[in-house]
């Protein structure tokens, strides 16, 4: 379970959800445990003690002295930035001493490798990206379930991977397929993780304070791929396509792309438009329409020039999730499931079934022919751009909050194209106002979200949407993005009551 180490001494840094999962896993396997957190009494300390886990706890600043006493592995919680000076010094000291530094994902990869010696060989699918991870992960899990597989969905989406694995072992119900949502934080410490197929949905500016630069952030995303992992890539995103192999050599990893245009390479996915209807399609070689995609791709790699046709899968409008960005998410999920040879028919039925996740371009009410859309999970610029372009209708946008140092310039074009007006809230409203001034779209500042919602309702016309997609974090005004969504919903409910409508 720990490489070539038997019951090692493990130092767990950070007692969040992943840190607690690492501690549980290590205790389960007889490791000696030292747990450190910069907080003297982190919330999960009580849970640790209640479960009777035998561990030394050290509160306060991290120092290299935490490695003393024979520490062999450092278990690093994903919320801890490697750029933080005290942590950087500790990690450097660990490297000098030959102490392994793993995150939860590496513990999970090592555990699967150990279980593999007993014959357990599940398929592993992994999803990352700045936006759309949770939707695509949940949808991929559903697709696999509807194909008759026993599925575990875990990771950034919760539950923690190690907790889910432990419960599966205890219940003697190990899944056929693991579907993992992975953040850049979790991938930063990946070393031997090698899923069967993995998708990068998009890469836009986010968490730059944690990673230090956009390039470092993108490189962390790329750690989702092992040497033989099928790569599912968004061909509309240049940063993502940097992970496509330069040459389709015989030993190159298989690559499948998806996008919002017609695919031109055999086995890729996209959208095709005909008589005003958008279709989800797969590019197929007319010479081998019934062969498996892997076989068709071997032909292409051998200098075969395919005669490409667009095989219609289903109308995009048959999806219950709104927006073109969700059509892209659906294509990514379908591509992942097909990469492990699941049959297409049940996958297509499941695509029609999936209703989406809360707070992600979720239509919560329609009042006087105006849609009220909760995208409170849109905590970065890329998410809001995707929501605006995906809805593709006139919108009164509500944006603002803690901008996390982002560049808001990518909002200019979609705001100019789609927005009737923009209501601004939160700490970085002035920064967004300055950026959007050139659009000529009316901009209004509001002290509260409730005031912004009521003002947006007054401006919206039939056929419009009032969209909460802040492009910012929520903590300057709210407990979290879910609390922000609750306030939005309450304001919409009040409008419905005022108008005598049912939200």
Curated annotation (Swiss-Prot):
<dbReference type="InterPro" id="IPR036615">
    <property type="entry name" value="Mur_ligase_C_dom_sf"/>
</dbReference>
<dbReference type="GO" id="GO:0008764">
    <property type="term" value="F:UDP-N-acetylmuramoylalanine-D-glutamate ligase activity"/>
</dbReference>
<keyword id="KW-0131">Cell cycle</keyword>
<dbReference type="GO" id="GO:0005524">
    <property type="term" value="F:ATP binding"/>
</dbReference>
<protein>
    <recommendedName>
        <fullName>UDP-N-acetylmuramoylalanine--D-glutamate ligase</fullName>
        <ecNumber>6.3.2.9</ecNumber>
    </recommendedName>
</protein>
<dbReference type="Pfam" id="PF21799">
    <property type="entry name" value="MurD-like_N"/>
</dbReference>
<comment type="similarity">
    <text>Belongs to the MurCDEF family.</text>
</comment>
<dbReference type="InterPro" id="IPR036565">
    <property type="entry name" value="Mur-like_cat_sf"/>
</dbReference>
<keyword id="KW-0963">Cytoplasm</keyword>
<dbReference type="GO" id="GO:0005737">
    <property type="term" value="C:cytoplasm"/>
</dbReference>
<dbReference type="GO" id="GO:0051301">
    <property type="term" value="P:cell division"/>
</dbReference>
<comment type="pathway">
    <text>Cell wall biogenesis; peptidoglycan biosynthesis.</text>
</comment>
<keyword id="KW-0067">ATP-binding</keyword>
<dbReference type="InterPro" id="IPR004101">
    <property type="entry name" value="Mur_ligase_C"/>
</dbReference>
<dbReference type="InterPro" id="IPR005762">
    <property type="entry name" value="MurD"/>
</dbReference>
<feature type="binding site">
    <location>
        <begin position="129"/>
        <end position="135"/>
    </location>
    <ligand>
        <name>ATP</name>
    </ligand>
</feature>
<keyword id="KW-0436">Ligase</keyword>
<keyword id="KW-0573">Peptidoglycan synthesis</keyword>
<keyword id="KW-0547">Nucleotide-binding</keyword>
<dbReference type="Pfam" id="PF02875">
    <property type="entry name" value="Mur_ligase_C"/>
</dbReference>
<dbReference type="GO" id="GO:0071555">
    <property type="term" value="P:cell wall organization"/>
</dbReference>
<dbReference type="Pfam" id="PF08245">
    <property type="entry name" value="Mur_ligase_M"/>
</dbReference>
<keyword id="KW-0132">Cell division</keyword>
<keyword id="KW-0961">Cell wall biogenesis/degradation</keyword>
<keyword id="KW-0133">Cell shape</keyword>
<comment type="function">
    <text>Cell wall formation. Catalyzes the addition of glutamate to the nucleotide precursor UDP-N-acetylmuramoyl-L-alanine (UMA).</text>
</comment>
<dbReference type="GO" id="GO:0009252">
    <property type="term" value="P:peptidoglycan biosynthetic process"/>
</dbReference>
<dbReference type="GO" id="GO:0008360">
    <property type="term" value="P:regulation of cell shape"/>
</dbReference>
<dbReference type="InterPro" id="IPR013221">
    <property type="entry name" value="Mur_ligase_cen"/>
</dbReference>
